[in-house]
């Protein structure tokens, strides 16, 4: 898969997005578009903590990439009026790395750990007393004479973000006071996000042009902002700078993004299941090998949206293309695939 395709439809943050995401990031809950139930519950928790003069309860945010987990963590810090320290699971390799971070926190500070599911179990164990008792247990000495020393930590808030909720251990999950799932955004919310971003970036666009971008954005704000930039470029070079419905449609067609936001790789995944494996069920690892892609990338980037559209089903024997997928790809639907199922299934994937 080319870097351009990855950059366009992936909900994951890439280098080109970082500066733009910061400039477009809302700074308070009322400006955060969508996720109403989450915002309401989070707003109550923040106000209650501020009124009591306490640190906010630990928060876990989970869902597909690009939906606003990092943005929400910054908003929480701004709403609480505290500092935020940002790190990620892969960056914390040893217990000492986490201990150094924890001991440098100030009262009520926020520690944001992205990809928290990638913490090792040894590192995770340091978090248990830190989250529950605001304490850090360290071992002093070695061998039979070693003893445990408990250091007090300031009251702080841990915000964990993950795309793999099921990979978190139960002891870690249980220590979060608030757990919120971010869902894909509906078209109206994405349209509002694209309109807001266009205004901030000074992009000229009519409502029909914005609609063309919104309906292809996979329900993901990060993808919407990325497509807006690419369509802006096309309008500047091929048109008069104004994003109209025709300009947006032409631009996105050139980028091989269809009317539902599916790109070449999405089509390849579905067509591989249909043409090579009789529509499925077929294991994830087999699909990955067939299209020369990593299984984790399919699972994190492509599969959630295909499931959301109802184009893909997860079964005990693997992934299966649905009737809707056949219709979208204009492929005749075959009802009788029993002979194929026995040939191409894998357990558990």
From Swiss-Prot:
Subunit architecture: Homohexamer. Forms an RuvA(8)-RuvB(12)-Holliday junction (HJ) complex. HJ DNA is sandwiched between 2 RuvA tetramers; dsDNA enters through RuvA and exits via RuvB. An RuvB hexamer assembles on each DNA strand where it exits the tetramer. Each RuvB hexamer is contacted by two RuvA subunits (via domain III) on 2 adjacent RuvB subunits; this complex drives branch migration. In the full resolvosome a probable DNA-RuvA(4)-RuvB(12)-RuvC(2) complex forms which resolves the HJ.
Localization terms from the record: Cytoplasm
Residues that hold Mg(2+) according to the record: 70
Residues reported in the UniProt entry to bind ATP: 24-25, 66, 69-71, 132-134, 175, 185, 222
GO BP term, pick one: DNA repair
One GO cellular component term noted in the UniProt record for this chain: Holliday junction resolvase complex
Principal cellular location given in the protein's record: cytoplasm
Binding site for DNA: 314, 319
The name this protein goes by in its record: Holliday junction branch migration complex subunit RuvB
Enzyme Commission number(s) from the entry: 3.6.4.-
InterPro entries per the UniProt record, alphabetical: AAA+_ATPase, AAA_lid_4, DNA_helicase_Holl-junc_RuvB, P-loop_NTPase, RuvB-like_N, RuvB_C, WH-like_DNA-bd_sf, WH_DNA-bd_sf
GO-annotated molecular function: ATP binding; ATP hydrolysis activity; four-way junction DNA binding; four-way junction helicase activity
Catalytic activity: ATP + H2O = ADP + phosphate + H(+)
Family (UniProt): Belongs to the RuvB family.
Entry keyword set: ATP-binding, Cytoplasm, DNA damage, DNA recombination, DNA repair, DNA-binding, Hydrolase, Nucleotide-binding
Free-text note on domains in this protein's UniProt record: Has 3 domains, the large (RuvB-L) and small ATPase (RuvB-S) domains and the C-terminal head (RuvB-H) domain. The head domain binds DNA, while the ATPase domains jointly bind ATP, ADP or are empty depending on the state of the subunit in the translocation cycle. During a single DNA translocation step the structure of each domain remains the same, but their relative positions change.
Record-linked PANTHER family: HOLLIDAY JUNCTION BRANCH MIGRATION COMPLEX SUBUNIT RUVB, PTHR42848
Region of interest called Head domain (RuvB-H), as start-end residue ranges on this chain: 259-349
Region annotated Small ATPAse domain (RuvB-S), chain positions: 186-256
A Pfam family annotated for this UniProt entry: RuvB_C
SUPFAM superfamilies noted in UniProt: P-loop containing nucleoside triphosphate hydrolases, Winged helix' DNA-binding domain
Job of this protein: The RuvA-RuvB-RuvC complex processes Holliday junction (HJ) DNA during genetic recombination and DNA repair, while the RuvA-RuvB complex plays an important role in the rescue of blocked DNA replication forks via replication fork reversal (RFR). RuvA specifically binds to HJ cruciform DNA, conferring on it an open structure. The RuvB hexamer acts as an ATP-dependent pump, pulling dsDNA into and through the RuvAB complex. RuvB forms 2 homohexamers on either side of HJ DNA bound by 1 or 2 RuvA tetramers; 4 subunits per hexamer contact DNA at a time.
């Amino acid at each position: 898969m080319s870097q351009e395709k990855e950059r366009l439809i992936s909900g994951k943050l890439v280098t080109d997005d970082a500066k733009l995401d910061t400039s477009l990031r809302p700074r308070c809950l009322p400006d955060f578009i969508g996720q109403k139930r989450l915002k309401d519950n989070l707003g109550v928790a923040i106000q209650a903590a501020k009124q009591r003069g306490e640190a906010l309860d630990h928060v876990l945010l989970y869902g597909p990439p690009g939906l606003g987990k990092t943005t929400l963590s910054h908003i929480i810090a701004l709403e609480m009026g505290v500092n935020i320290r940002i790190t990620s699971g892969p960056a914390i390799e040893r217990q000492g790395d986490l201990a150094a971070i924890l001991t440098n926190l100030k009262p009520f500070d926020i520690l944001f750990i992205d990809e928290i599911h990638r913490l090792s179990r040894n590192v995770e164990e340091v978090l248990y007393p830190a989250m529950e008792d605001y304490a850090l247990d360290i071992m002093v000495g070695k061998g039979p004479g070693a003893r445990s020393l408990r250091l007090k930590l300031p009251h702080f808030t841990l915000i964990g973000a993950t795309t793999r909720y099921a990979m978190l251990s139960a002891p870690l999950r249980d220590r979060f006071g608030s757990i919120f799932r971010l869902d894909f955004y509906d078209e109206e919310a994405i349209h509002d996000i694209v309109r807001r971003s266009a205004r901030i970036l000074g992009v000229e666009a009519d409502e029909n042009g914005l609609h063309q971008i919104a309906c292809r954005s996979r329900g993901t704000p990060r993808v919407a902002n990325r497509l807006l930039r690419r369509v802006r470029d096309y309008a500047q070079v091929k048109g008069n700078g104004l994003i109209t419905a025709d300009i947006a449609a032409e631009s996105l067609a050139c980028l091989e993004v269809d009317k539902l936001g599916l790109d070449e790789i999405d089509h390849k995944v579905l067509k591989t299941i249909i043409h090579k494996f009789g529509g499925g069920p077929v294991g994830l690892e087999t699909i990955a090998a067939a299209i020369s892609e990593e299984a984790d990338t399919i699972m994190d980037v492509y599969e959630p949206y295909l499931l959301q559209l109802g184009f893909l089903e997860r079964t005990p024997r693997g992934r299966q293309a649905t009737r809707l997928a056949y219709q979208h790809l204009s492929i005749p639907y075959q009802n009788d695939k029993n002979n194929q199922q026995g040939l191409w299934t894998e357990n558990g994937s």
